[in-house]
Amino acid sequence: MYGHLSLSALSLFAVVAAAPFRESWLQPRDSPVSQLFRRTAPDPNSNDYMSYYPGPGSTPNVSTIPQAWLDKLATVNLPNVPVATPDGGRPTYPNNEDDGDSTICSFTDQCRVEDDLYSPPGEKIWALSFDDGPTDVSPALYDYLAQNNISSSATHFMIGGNVITSPQSVLVAVKAGGHLAVHTWSHPYMTTLTNEQVVGELGWTMQALSDLNGGRIPMYWRPPYGDVDNRVRAIAKEVFGLVTVLWDSDTNDWAITDEPGQYSVASVEAYFDTLVTGNRTQGLLLLEHELDNNTVEVFETEYPKAVGNGWTVKNVADAFNMEWYLNSGKGNNDVVTTMSVAGTLTTATPTNTSTYVASSTAASSASVTDSAGVSIASAASSEASSSWAIANRPSHFVIAIACGLALAAIMV
């Protein structure tokens, strides 16, 4: 009977047949299908770009935190460590609890845990990193890194508020191959924040960096002032899969001033010399900054000395033989596994116009474990850019028409 149908009739059949497919494709927001899609990153060139994030310069309001992040937090069995109180730059704990004991384990008191990254393995490996970017001097630093072919050998621990105010600088670092990591949203003493505030500081910075780096989710974070304890470590690791990165030597480049008797460019460089030009062979993970001209000058002076003395610079991930990102391998061009921050799959919504909605992990998602041993939710499919793939996916309407035409050719 089909042999007598005209081509136009078969095409019409294809159009009609396509309707149920399109209806099933347009799933409600809370359906498992929609939960599989990555959030669409806002355009950093658009006038409303910053409206998709909390305001810079202060801890994000808890009301801006996606519910999925809070739901994940609720599943974490946190250690019994109280919130610390700010006390002149050294957070203190109730009842004069010892912040250096194994229960609290604050790095302010030089306490570390096994999972912390502290000194890289291997001889004369310099795990190169810069905190506090992007800033006004970041372009000059990035130019120097590029000129010396070491852009991909540097980890940039970026402040979320700086990221959204200077997205073009971040894009320069990404294009050059720089490794992006988290330095919180507003650079607070993290142990003095509530659990929810810790989530906001970390999660929003991860989201802002991911949005500018093809959906790659940061895997590493460095606590401002080195202020971290076991409660904050647990939130970073169990909610977001973040690895805590500390340092084995503070260059004090951040403290350089013109005041007599204080740190100067010359004194910081003199200390730097003892690390990279002496007989030391143990790996280095230094505290350095892309903060101002002084910090950049120190690095540009010391880098040639280190190389001349046999040191090899690597970014933090490579120095510890680990992956760069939670959902990608090494580099900013590796394939991205479809997932989003805290294993959720969401759509961007301006935070100043409506509540940010983040879906929970879809039932059809697979549980995978990253190299740090953290279980994260990852969609079963892997696409280099799922948002691109979705936007360019042939519609069922088109597919149905094509099938109808093919059927017509066979039947005639």
UniProtKB/Swiss-Prot annotation:
Membrane topology per record: Lipid-anchor; GPI-anchor
Cofactor section: Co(2+)
GO terms, molecular function: chitin binding; chitin deacetylase activity; metal ion binding
GO-annotated cellular components: extracellular region; fungal-type cell wall; plasma membrane; side of membrane
Region (Disordered): 82-103
Uses described in the biotechnology field: A strain lacking CDA1, CDA2, and CDA3 is a potential vaccine candidate; inoculation with heat-killed CDA1-CDA2-CDA3 knockout cells in mouse induces protective immunity to subsequent virulent fungal infection.
Signal peptide (UniProt feature, chain positions): 1-18
Database matches in PANTHER family: CHITIN DEACETYLASE 3 (PTHR10587:SF135), GLYCOSYL TRANSFERASE-RELATED (PTHR10587)
Entry protein name: Chitin deacetylase 3
Organism: Cryptococcus neoformans var. grubii serotype A (strain H99 / ATCC 208821 / CBS 10515 / FGSC 9487) (Filobasidiella neoformans var. grubii)
